[in-house]
Regions:
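Membrane-proximal basic amphipathic "stem/tether" segments
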Residues: 1-28
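S-adenosyl-L-methionine
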Residues: 80-132
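Short, charged, surface-exposed secondary-structure boundary motifs
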Residues: 75-84, 99-104, 173-179, 194-199
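C-terminal substrate-binding/active-site "lid" region of AdoMet-derived donor-dependent transferases
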Residues: 128-214
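SAM cofactor-binding core of SAM-dependent methyltransferases
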Residues: 31-102
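Soluble or luminal CAZymes and related metallo-dependent hydrolases
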Residues: 28-33, 120, 144, 148
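Short, flexible loop segments at the rims of nucleotide/cofactor-binding pockets, characterized by
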Residues: 23-28, 44-47, 112-119, 138-140
Length: 214
């Protein structure tokens, strides 16, 4: 079974088979969370998301300026055909991935993925550091969510304005709650809304969370 799955994921990675993804309307598990995201996106002038999907299509349909970071090559190619502003969709490879962009054979490969992981999390921030324009809305909904939060903390800690940062699937996932050492949060449905930065050193956790793809 694992052999068949590996072959399937290899074929998918190299776009040798057609995958029919079903993307519905934006749904974050509750009316409160879904409406909060939609209204926040409508107000946004510049939106960044880690993890693509229905939110990407909505941002495109609303003619928003946005950057979407996607690590599943096959899904990235699928989305390219769904949006007009293709340059706003960015592929950052984590190699061959399975469901929800989890790297294949992660426990074996996690130490070898470190360079790719840093590119996935930080390339967009490196680009933004050279720009006068920064996002006012950020959705963390892809891989390496704690690491994304730590890098965002470091990026915005000395900036004048703090964006609205939404961390999806935070409710009931205790392994994410370490970020409360770095952000003051409030809950909206399953979202943690990161509202205020806390001055703390992230360096001791960066290496740890480059090995945690959750």
């Amino acid at each position: 079974m694992k052999f068949k799955l590996t072959i399937y994921l290899l074929l998918k990675y190299y776009n040798l088979i057609e995958t029919n993804y079903k993307i519905g309307n934006v749904n974050f598990g509750s009316e409160d969370a879904t409406n909060f995201f939609i209204e926040s996106l409508k107000k946004s002038n510049f939106y960044l998301e880690y993890g693509s999907g229905s939110s990407t299509i909505l941002a495109s349909n609303l003619n928003k300026t946005f950057i979407s970071i996607e690590s599943d090559k096959n899904f990235y190619n699928f989305l390219l055909n769904k949006i007009d502003n293709k340059e706003m969709l960015n592929f950052k490879s984590l190699g061959i991935v399975g469901d929800y962009s989890t790297p294949l054979f992660f426990n074996i490969r996690k130490h070898f993925l470190k360079s790719k992981v840093i590119h996935y999390v930080n390339d967009v921030l490196d680009t933004l550091s050279k720009s006068t324009k920064v996002p006012d809305l950020i959705l963390i909904d892809g891989r390496y969510r704690v690491l994304c939060s730590l890098f965002l903390h470091n990026f915005f800690i000395n900036k004048k304005d703090m964006p609205l940062i939404i961390f999806d699937d935070y409710l009931n996932r205790d392994y994410y709650h370490v970020i409360e050492n770095f952000f003051k949060i409030r809950m909206v449905g399953r979202f943690a809304v990161l509202e205020e930065l806390i001055q703390n050193d992230t360096r001791h956790l960066i290496s740890k969370y480059t090995l945690d793809a959750r």
